[in-house]
C-alpha cells in the first residue's frame, strides 16, 4: 500500500488543536484557594506603612494564577506558634482582588497580644504562610442593594475597600450602587490607605468617605470622637429595603454600632451575620 501524507492530515489537525487548547487552558487564570486545605504561599514583598502596620504580598504559584476569592469573603491564616497547644488560625480580608494575578495582598496591623499578626510581622521575604479559604457569609454581587452604608475602624477597612473597588470597577457594566463610608481612627496617622480611599472618592461621585478621629489635628473638618447614632443618621442612608449597613472593626466598636443602628430603625444585627441581614458585621 502506498503511503499518502494526506491521510495523516486529520490527525495532524487534531494534534495541533489539542496542543493549542492545552496551551490556552494552561496559560489561563487558575483559582488556587482550597476551602478545606491549608496551602503555603511565599512572602514576596513587605511594604511598611507604620511602626506596626504593613502590606504583605504573597506569591501565587504562577503569574497568571488568581486567589479565587469572592468579593466580600476572607481567608484563614494558620501558624504553629510556640506556647500554643494547637495551630492558631485567624481570618483576614485581602485588599487585592482576582483582578490582580500572580499574588495577593494583606494589610495587617500587629498587636502585642496578636499571635498571628506578630507571626506575619516576623516573616522574612521568601518564607511561607499557611492559607486556606474562601470563608464568610458576605458575597457581593452588582446592584444587590441601592445604597451601602459602611462603618469601619482601623484595619476593618479591608473588606470595605474590597467591596468599594468592585463596585467602581463595575460601573461600566451597569453597577449603580451608592456607598457612604464612615472610617474611624484614633489619630491622623492611623488612617490606613487614605490616599487610595481619597482617589476612589475623587474618581467616583457615588462613593463618599467620612473620616472620624478621636484626636483630630488643628483645622480638622471631619468627625470627632466615637461614631455615634447621630453621625450614622447624618452620613449613611436611612433604613430601607434596598439599603444595607456593613460593619467591621474592633469588637467594642462593632457592639456599639449594632446598638446604634438598631436605635435608628435598622433591623437588629444578629450574633452571626447572614447575607440577607440589613446590618451585616464582618
From Swiss-Prot:
Keyword Lipid biosynthesis part of the UniProt annotation: no
TM helices/strands, residue ranges: 2-22
Record's keyword annotation contains Oxidoreductase: yes
A molecular function GO annotation: NADH dehydrogenase activity
Cell location: Mitochondrion outer membrane
GO terms for biological process, alphabetical: protein histidyl modification to diphthamide; tRNA wobble base 5-methoxycarbonylmethyl-2-thiouridinylation
EC number of the protein: 1.6.2.2
Membrane topology summary: Single-pass membrane protein
Enzyme class, spelled out: oxidoreductase
Pathway: Protein modification; peptidyl-diphthamide biosynthesis
Cofactor(s) it depends on: FAD
Entry-linked Pfam families: FAD_binding_6 (PF00970), NAD_binding_1 (PF00175)
Binding site for FAD: 121-136, 147-181
Record-linked PROSITE patterns: FAD_FR (PS51384)
GO cellular component: mitochondrial outer membrane
Function description: NADH-dependent reductase for DPH3 and cytochrome b5. Required for the first step of diphthamide biosynthesis, a post-translational modification of histidine which occurs in elongation factor 2. DPH1 and DPH2 transfer a 3-amino-3-carboxypropyl (ACP) group from S-adenosyl-L-methionine (SAM) to a histidine residue, the reaction is assisted by a reduction system comprising DPH3 and a NADH-dependent reductase, predominantly CBR1. By reducing DPH3, also involved in the formation of the tRNA wobble base modification mcm5s 2U (5-methoxycarbonylmethyl-2-thiouridine), mediated by the elongator complex.
Protein's UniProt name: NADH-cytochrome b5 reductase 1
Species of provenance: Phaeosphaeria nodorum (strain SN15 / ATCC MYA-4574 / FGSC 10173)
Amino acid at each position: 500500500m502506498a503511503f499518502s501524507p494526506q491521510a495523516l492530515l486529520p490527525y495532524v489537525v487534531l494534534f495541533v488543536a489539542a496542543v493549542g487548547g492545552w496551551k490556552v487552558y494552561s496559560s489561563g487564570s487558575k483559582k488556587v484557594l482550597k476551602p478545606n486545605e491549608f496551602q503555603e504561599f511565599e512572602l514576596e514583598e513587605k511594604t511598611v506603612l507604620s511602626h506596626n502596620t504593613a502590606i504583605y504580598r504573597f506569591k501565587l504559584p504562577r503569574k497568571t494564577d488568581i486567589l479565587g476569592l469572592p468579593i466580600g469573603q476572607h481567608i484563614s491564616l494558620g501558624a504553629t506558634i510556640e506556647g500554643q497547644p494547637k495551630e492558631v488560625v485567624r481570618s483576614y480580608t485581602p485588599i487585592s482582588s482576582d483582578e490582580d494575578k500572580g499574588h495577593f495582598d494583606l494589610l495587617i496591623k500587629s498587636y502585642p497580644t496578636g499571635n498571628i499578626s506578630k507571626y506575619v510581622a516576623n516573616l522574612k521575604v521568601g518564607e511561607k504562610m499557611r492559607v486556606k479559604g474562601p470563608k464568610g457569609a458576605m458575597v457581593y454581587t452588582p446592584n444587590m442593594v441601592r445604597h451601602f452604608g459602611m462603618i469601619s475602624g482601623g484595619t476593618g477597612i479591608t473588606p470595605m475597600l474590597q467591596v468599594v473597588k468592585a463596585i467602581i470597577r463595575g460601573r461600566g457594566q451597569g453597577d449603580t450602587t451608592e456607598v457612604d463610608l464612615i472610617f474611624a481612627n484614633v489619630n491622623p496617622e492611623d488612617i490606613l490607605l487614605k490616599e487610595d480611599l481619597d482617589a476612589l472618592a475623587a474618581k467616583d461621585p457615588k462613593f463618599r468617605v467620612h473620616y472620624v478621629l478621636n484626636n483630630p489635628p488643628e483645622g480638622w473638618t471631619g468627625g470627632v470622637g466615637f461614631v455615634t447614632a447621630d453621625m450614622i443618621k447624618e452620613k449613611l442612608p436611612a433604613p430601607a429595603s434596598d439599603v444595607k449597613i456593613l460593619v467591621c472593626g474592633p469588637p467594642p466598636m462593632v457592639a456599639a454600632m449594632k446598638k446604634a443602628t438598631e436605635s435608628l430603625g435598622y433591623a437588629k444585627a444578629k450574633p452571626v451575620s447572614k447575607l440577607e441581614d440589613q446590618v451585616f458585621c464582618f
